[in-house]
């Protein structure tokens, strides 16, 4: 039996009341994109505070794709034990955007969803979410939505080639490679773009490392986090 008819949302759980300045529906995001005059919009999914590699990755994607803006779309639902609470992530991300991105190039919003850690399949689901919100590309990096070493490092990218039929989605993915802080260049780079570097020339950045530092009461160094962000964390 197939049933159809108008869809009515009864409520948005606690997300609308707990995060009134951040939670937005897909239609509200589409309306905001239209009001800003953006045509090409890159989405960045995050469950962590954004460290320097995340920041630079957004900048790289915008430049490479000649995008009008980027949607930083944070997850507001349940995470793993030890993850940073949503209100702290929200504050730190907005602070980073205010200090380090040009005006009217970034939209910070959140959505009501629990992290599933389903790796490649969740990456496809994330792409559908951002397509519904009006984005044209989604950044998919190493081990997107992964947990431990369960999935291959780039399975969340190759699933779009192997399992998603051509034309099934109206959104493309921006494939991010390994990123790291270059001691030589004093900035974050994609490691494949720095062939003259040795392993010692890089500082590897990760959300796990940041969480471990914070758990020990250590402020992340400037290679990891902007000082304004580290102060909030």
Spans of model-derived segments:
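Active-site cores that bind ATP or allylic diphosphates and position pyrophosphate for catalysis
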Residues: 1-49, 53-233
